[in-house]
Amino acid sequence: MSSHLARLEALLFVAGEDGLSLRTMAQLLEIPVTGLTQSLEKLQAKYEADEDTALCLLESSNTYKIVTKPDFACLLRDYSKTPINQSLSRASLEVLSIVAYKQPITRAEVDDIRGVNSSGAIAKLQAFGLIREAGKKDAVGRPNLYATTDYFLDYIGINSLDELVAIDQLELEEQETSLFREDAPEDLEDLDN
């Protein structure tokens, strides 16, 4: 079984920018808060001692999160200024689609739909101005809600979200396309068989 430290790091990684409270981490890890505090101190010491990691532990308003070290601020600022004309990754496009159709939505809800962590894609989409924080969800931990921006509408060439293709329509078109792609005979001779 994984160490408490590895399990703690995994939870904080998946929590992303929302972070986790001491109480939530203690419940999930099934350890007392005193033991958790010691583990957090060990994790912070590990990050500080390792010059080959860009990560550090940040505590803010009784919430802990894994973030990049301040030394990398200039590099990340330059990255965030990268022009939007470069193509978005498949992951970013998936996240953008989910946010567009399900907004407002939390990162955890996006993760549930995709089955993987979406923190990086969300950060990139925010940096490009395609999505924004749209408040906090009234739930445990008060996670951020995300929604698309006016720039998103301009970027995809529509005037309002009402102009998005209905999901049912997309599913129907996808099924029709897959019928012709996957189930189509390799050549016309197969039609006779």
From Swiss-Prot:
Transferase found in the keyword field: no
Compartments (UniProt record): Cytoplasm
GO term, biological process aspect, one: DNA replication
InterPro entries assigned: ScpB_csome_segregation, WH-like_DNA-bd_sf, WH_DNA-bd_sf
Top-rank taxon, per record: Bacteria
Keyword Manganese: no
Entry keywords, A to Z: Cell cycle, Cell division, Chromosome partition, Cytoplasm
Gene Ontology CC annotations of this record: cytoplasm
Coiled coil: none
Major localisation: cytoplasm
Quaternary context: Homodimer. Homodimerization may be required to stabilize the binding of ScpA to the Smc head domains. Component of a cohesin-like complex composed of ScpA, ScpB and the Smc homodimer, in which ScpA and ScpB bind to the head domain of Smc. The presence of the three proteins is required for the association of the complex with DNA.
Physiological role: Participates in chromosomal partition during cell division. May act via the formation of a condensin-like complex containing Smc and ScpA that pull DNA away from mid-cell into both cell halves.
Similarity comment: family membership: Belongs to the ScpB family.
Protein name: Segregation and condensation protein B
Organism per entry: Streptococcus thermophilus (strain ATCC BAA-250 / LMG 18311)
Lineage of the organism: Bacteria, Bacillati, Bacillota, Bacilli, Lactobacillales
